[in-house]
Amino acid sequence: MGKEKTHVNVVVIGHVDSGKSTTTGHLIYKCGGIDKRTIEKFEKEAAELGKGSFKYAWVLDKLKAERERGITIDIALWKFETPKYHVTVIDAPGHRDFIKNMITGTSQADCGILIIAAGTGEFEAGISKDGQTREHALLAFTLGVRQLIVAINKMDSTKWSEQRFNEIIKEVSGFIKKIGFNPKSVPFVPISGWHGDNMLEESTNMPWYKGWNKETKAGAKSGKTLLDAIDAIDPPQRPSDKPLRLPLQDVYKIGGIGTVPVGRVETGVIKAGMVVTFAPANVTTEVKSVEMHHEQLVEGLPGDNVGFNVKNVSVKDIRRGNVCSDSKNDPAKEAGSFTAQVIVLNHPGQIGAGYAPVLDCHTAHIACKFAELLEKIDRRSGKKLEDAPKFVKSGDSAIVKMIPSKPMCVEAYTDYPPLGRFAVRDMRQTVAVGVIKAVEKVDKAGKVTKAAAKAGEK
């Protein structure tokens, strides 16, 4: 068996017709968690419906339809393996809610796979000024995705043309460079997601193709196929090295034990004996024990849903939406105000200063006022369009100063990603999403329990 493989999350980006469903379907199908029985069932259905030619995309459509109907699909279906990694596809291609999912999604993508259709006209449509591709790639970059793989798909439709491949590399390099990626660190792979060329095995149809290479801080790497390129992703730095952030989902009072906050560790580590601070409640106390699934844990790591017992704190002191942190290592604080880049998705009117919708950020659900619209920016290029706009409407992106109506704890996205992205809810729908750029933190004296004071003296 050997060592457990490292997990990486990829997000697949590309125009609706770039063939990303087929390509993703192919990888999941060939290297993934779909068992033989399910595949045979899907293939039979596809053939009966005369969709034989779409079998990979069809597999994906089936999965997607089931997911959207709320049938919980075995999440293994969205996974595949490379020699080095367990890969999870965190946003399935072609999703209407791509932007919302990317920003409010639970996981952070480690790498983007940009799928470009090589066919004449198709490539141009995908990358045109209003192109979705551009926007999704910029969004991935804004959300901290720094590794990218470009798969140039449907090479069969260009008769496997080297000239077309090089032409596209040139265009795409310029395009991703504008966003902020370094083309030298990006593998460009010519593929056919449908026929399987250069997906897992080297293609015999493109003898001119000598392979891809990339240079990153981790050194130079080269390979032939898309699978090679995914296997060559630089291993992500995991958030266990960061200071602790654990947003509370609930706080229970358990007879004979006391107060037990519950939540998911987003960054850092929590263990018994630690002195923790809850923000914005501003209460500091000692952790007596940590458990998961009713078993004692030595430590809770990022991704773990834990319950932990705290001394001398009543259920009234802390609540859902509070954030637990290490009192000695960048403790969490209340946010007096913060600036964020907000993308308006669907709002029927105009949004101006004074608008005060509810923000969902980690487990907090609190109204925040749009105090000032600082600038309007171009969603596709990230460039400033105007200073201090009066209003923003659907489709606009703006830098906004926001003030919470009640004490709230949030962080800059670059410091603690899960606490730095939010959804704006109004009229029972998500009207906008945002990424926090900077937070003005409030310093004030808080309550330190006897247990914490004692533990601090040790």
Swiss-Prot record:
Residues 70-74 are annotated as: G2. The keyword Amino-acid biosynthesis does not apply. PROSITE patterns: G_TR_1, G_TR_2. The modification N6-methyllysine is found at K3, K30, K316, K390. GTP binds at residues 14-21, 91-95, 153-156. The modification N,N,N-trimethylglycine is found at G2. It is found in: Cytoplasm. Pfam families: GTP-eEF1A_C, GTP_EFTU, GTP_EFTU_D2. Residues 153-156 are annotated as: G4. The modification N6,N6,N6-trimethyllysine is found at K79. Residues 91-94 are annotated as: G3. One of its GO terms (molecular function) is GTP binding. GO terms for cellular component: cytoplasm. This protein promotes the GTP-dependent binding of aminoacyl-tRNA to the A-site of ribosomes during protein biosynthesis. This is Elongation factor 1-alpha. It comes from Absidia glauca.
